Amino acid sequence: MRLRSCPQSQRMRHRSDTSRRAADRGFIWIVLLLGVASTPQMLHSQYRKWSITAAVGYNRLNLDAVDEKNQSDVDGWGNQGIPVGTFASVRRSPFYSAGVRYRYDREFAISLTASYWSKTVSSSYDGPDAELHLDRGVGSTDVVLGIAYYPSVRPYFLEWYIQTNLGLAMARASARAVGSRMQKDGSVLIPVLFVDTEGTSAKSKMSAGLSMGADIRLFSGFSLTMAAGYRFAQLGILESDITRFGQHSNEPTTIEFDYSGVLVSAGLLFEL
């Protein structure tokens, strides 16, 4: 029996088809591997975004000692025959903040925020026998580093988070008293200063806090952001620069300042 051999052209065509199929399979595997490898990066890329925030808020701080000292001064002047009015409380005031945030992944973000608040209250007495004007002020500039955790369970229309904060509180306080009494100079009454005192105090100290917040997306790249939390910032005794009738001195305050308290805010977030 004679065996029929395949022509040379058929053997070459068979090897060519086999090589082509192997190349196609290799290309498919490369595409699949690249897709699998790039999936985590694609998921990260949708969260790795910078954003800026701007907000206004309201704080309620533990400045009861300041209110009590102000009332004590009012009572003291009243005992001297100068019935000045009562001071308003300094415990509640608005604040303003701005910051940047970096969303690292689906669960974590870091932020750096600066905030400012200040409040001044006044009291006075204007009578035929004397005049007295009193001013008291408190305030603080804060720089805060926050680390936020976004739980996996959350509604589709908002992202809520829990955040720990570590910051630097740069506190300040001020006091001013200017008063004069009417005295006779011959047959004429003239005002004579009996008090002219001004003092400024400042101190910086680390603060810590815990807050909860939520971002509600309004449209692409633009969200409403809200937050509420508590800050620990016990400043204690402040060093004061005091001027009495033009004479300067450095003295510690007679009360402790506690800038701890509750803060709530609302603002806007812009994705970059």
Language model segments and positions:
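Gram-negative (and chloroplast) outer-membrane scaffold detector with strong preference
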Residues: 46-51, 58-60, 101-187, 218, ...
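Transmembrane beta-barrel architecture of outer-membrane proteins
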Residues: 91-95, 140-144, 205-209, 223, ...
